[in-house]
Amino acid sequence: MRQLLLLRRSLISVRFSSYSVSPQATISHDGPNPPTLAEHVDITIAGGGLVGSAMALAFASSPLFKSYKIVLLESQSKLPQVSKNKPYSNRVCALNAQSINLFETFDQEHPSENDSLACIVENDVIQSCLLERLKQFHIEPRLNSKVKNFEYEENSIRIKLQDEKINLRTGLLIAADGYQSSIREMARISTMQWDYNQYGIVATLQLADNMPDNIVAWQRFLPTGPIACLPLSNTHSSLVWTVPKSMHKTLMQLSDEQFVAEINKAFTSDVYKQSGTISITERIRSYWQKLIPVSPTTFQYPPVIINIEPRSRAAFPLTLLNANQYARPRLVLIGDSAHRIHPMAGQGVNMGFGDVLCLINILEQAVRDGADFSSLTYLVDYERQRQLQCLARLLSIDSLNRLYSTSFSPIVALRSVGLSFVNEFSLLKKFFAKQAASRS
């Protein structure tokens, strides 16, 4: 049974008061161009993916924005379709406690009692839930709608859409159009970014039938990059394997049987261990065990992979990106438009949901203050808070990636000892687990 089906049911089942939206059209006379219809809206969200849809739902479910008109633009021509009979998607995310907090603001009647470190959910399932919930507020993405350009007017931004005769006049434009954000480019917002010269390979894995309950995520740090196996059900897991550019083509060209063999070898084989560091690690471990008694632990083995779902193998380049500004007058960036992180810690979409939570809280305060919610004063507050948090996380994950990418023996021994130390001391392990599961 799929993870977080309760989340899907609860998001759809809760009833809120809804309001109707009716476009108001005016005639715009700008220069020699013929008059064009201009639809007046309060908030325009460009990008109907996970973060953009969550942003729209945050506004729709907020009592303070009940009378505001929200428009959600989506450049794609169709929305994801979810069916229990469909194979698992290869695009999943690990929702952390803060992201679950955000979903609970959409469903206050059914708070989650889950204290897991994370919940592994298919992206399509999350987006389908969000869009289904938006329908109850009479908000649906406008498909095939991409921002061609925009310009500032006295009290609004006028947006011209590709292949549409109607312009939008909006009080606030929120860019959620991905890491290659065209809106960010149009606004000439510079970025800090670099290429990791790595690829992430994803696939949906089929597990052996005799495996115990598949509720643990596995990650192994190899000299070539981390490999992770994320549980979906007792029969399936999701693969995220970071490899150098020079290696990804070889793996992508293997047959399914050969690829499965490489995955199992990557999780279990000693071929990836550096022999020079094993003896150092063992000596240090035996020394601390004499000083501090540790409780015996049962060694767990990663699941045995027997196959992959057909056509689920895919690869994408890995980069780090952070916009130098998240806010401009009447314009904000959220999600991958603002930042992109290495996938080794599964923080990408969680950071985007963190943007949503931060922005809605700040704009709600603006409404309470009786101020213009699109005022740069409030938008800069969002930028300040999120830049501080996101940049710290980007750089910490980047540092971890570099730490686990080195083959320098003393560093390899030190990190191995550190992980072993945490694993063998239950109190320390519980402390880190509690911090990771914290919803604050």
Regions found by a protein language model. Name each.
Residues 35-40, 105-186, 192-204:
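Conserved N-terminal helical subregion
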Residues 297-301, 361-440:
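C-terminal helical "tail/cap" subdomain of flavin- and related membrane-associated enzymes
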